[in-house]
Amino acid sequence: MNFFGIGLPEMLVILAIALLVFGPKKLPEIGRSLGKALRGFQDASREFESEIKREIDRTPATPAEATVEPPVLDSAPTEAVTVEKQTETQV
């Protein structure tokens, strides 16, 4: 039996020390309050997990980015561009 990484011999030693420190009358009360605290922690963690799952299911998936294609030109520009070669002295 392994509980939180503690084996049976270690658990018996801890129980014996608790019995000596708190006494036999106080141990059931401590066990009850410890059990209630653990149950409350488990309930809160389950509630948190279900809330996260609910939020994930509720949020819509982001739409894929729309691709915009550039317009296709029907023809080349009508204006003619003249290119003259200049020598270094003209520049």
UniProtKB/Swiss-Prot annotation:
Cellular component GO terms held in the UniProt record: TAT protein transport complex
GO biological process: protein transport by the Tat complex
Membrane topology of the entry: Single-pass membrane protein
InterPro entries per the UniProt record, alphabetical: TatA/B/E (IPR003369), TatA/E (IPR006312)
Annotated region described as Disordered, given as residue ranges: 57-91
Ranges annotated as spanning the membrane: 3-23
NCBIfam families membership: PRK14857.1 (NF011429), PRK14861.1 (NF011430), tatAE (TIGR01411)
Name of the protein in its database record: Sec-independent protein translocase protein TatA
Lineage, uppermost ranks: Bacteria, Bacillati, Cyanobacteriota, Cyanophyceae, Synechococcales
